[in-house]
Swiss-Prot record:
Name of the gene encoding the protein in the UniProt record: DK-ACO1
Gene3D superfamilies: B-lactam Antibiotic, Isopenicillin N Synthase, Chain
Name of the featured protein: 1-aminocyclopropane-1-carboxylate oxidase
Pathway note: Alkene biosynthesis; ethylene biosynthesis via S-adenosyl-L-methionine; ethylene from S-adenosyl-L-methionine: step 2/2
SUPFAM superfamilies: Clavaminate synthase-like
Domain Fe2OG dioxygenase: 153-253
EC number, UniProt record: 1.14.17.4
Organism: Diospyros kaki (Kaki persimmon)
Induction cue: By water stress.
């Protein structure tokens, strides 16, 4: 079996750059996922993020999860639970406006550390988007502009903990789905596994690695690349031992960004048969909210129905 793609970003600055770009392109085309090492975010900062996140969960969320979810979700069940997830989560918004100061129960160290971490992830996301542009033959900055809208991109972090589950065979930590947005940067637990992606009809583990950042592509990049890159189904399998930490940061288009295949990636002779629609990102998100755990193709088809109403202005400039 092929091994999960791991990209050493230190090699981007030397004679192995072309080969490394090839690995990134192959991962985007054939996996929809890859894992970055030596990505430039200090290991000491990542250790601090992990420490304060796990401390916050134990102090503020663990008991709440036991009372509100764990005590009720598995009571008397015999068949698989398909309408909920075994996870404890909250969301931090960074762009266009941060909400970190408003989220209750966060101490000042946590707010400061997560703000620093988010700023570094934002830069890494934009750097990766430019690498994707290079591999796709698009002008530098194209994807960032495509995401921009009038107020810039949406960027936020879902902080999740997946506690041990006594009936891990009957409930998922997180049910299978593709991500709606752009590019996702995940800092995951390096000891407790659980994340899996679907490749060639088989569920494959995303290996936990210390200080790595896992990258996956969302539905919007599939549309903009006209299907050259694909978003991929993934899930979190509940574990009987250990609490898994997951800090997933989503660099997404702005709400009013108009998303459509890059003209340079649409073959002229098949323009009439475009697979992917043009739509406003916020409209897609409203649809996705109801259909997250279903196939993405009907979502794309549904957006074609409203395509006639989309006012396609020029691509935004930063």
């Amino acid at each position: 079996m092929e091994s999960f793609p791991v990209i050493n970003m230190e090699k981007m600055n030397g004679e192995e750059r072309a080969a490394t770009m090839g690995l990134i392109n192959d991962a985007c085309e054939n996996w929809g996922f890859f894992e970055l090492v030596n990505h430039g975010i200090p290991p000491e900062l990542m250790d601090t993020v992990e420490r304060v996140t796990k401390a916050h969960y134990k102090k503020c969320m663990e008991q709440r999860f036991k009372e509100l979810v764990a005590s009720k979700a598995l009571e008397g069940i015999q068949a698989e639970v398909t309408d909920m997830d075994w996870e404890s989560t909250y969301f931090l918004r960074h762009l266009p406006q941060s909400n970190i100061s408003e989220v209750p129960d966060l101490d000042e160290e946590y707010r400061r550390v997560m703000k620093d971490f988010a700023e570094r992830l934002e830069k890494l996301a934009e750097y990766l988007l430019d690498l994707l542009c290079e591999n796709l033959g698009l002008e530098k900055g194209y994807l960032k502009k495509a995401f921009y809208g009038t107020k810039g991109p949406n960027f936020g972090t879902k902080v999740a903990n997946y506690p041990p589950c006594p009936k891990a065979d009957l409930i998922k930590g997180l049910r299978a789905h593709t991500d709606a947005g752009g590019i996702i940067l995940l800092f995951q637990d390096d000891k407790v596994s659980g994340l899996q992606l679907l490749k060639d009809d088989q569920w494959i583990d995303v290996p936990p690695m210390k200080h790595s950042i896992v990258i996956n592509l969302g539905d919007q990049l599939e549309v903009i690349t006209n299907g050259k890159y694909k978003s991929v189904l993934h899930r979190v399998v509940a574990q009987t031992d250990g609490t898994r930490m997951s800090i997933a940061s989503f660099y997404n288009p702005g709400n009013d960004a108009v998303i459509y295949p890059a003209p340079a990636l649409v073959e002229k002779e098949v323009e009439e048969k475009e697979v992917y629609p043009k739509f406003v990102f916020d409209d897609y998100m409203k649809l996705y909210a109801a259909l997250k755990f279903q196939a993405k193709e009907p979502r794309f088809e549904a957006m074609k129905a409203v395509e006639a109403n989309v006012n396609l202005g020029p691509i935004a400039t930063v």
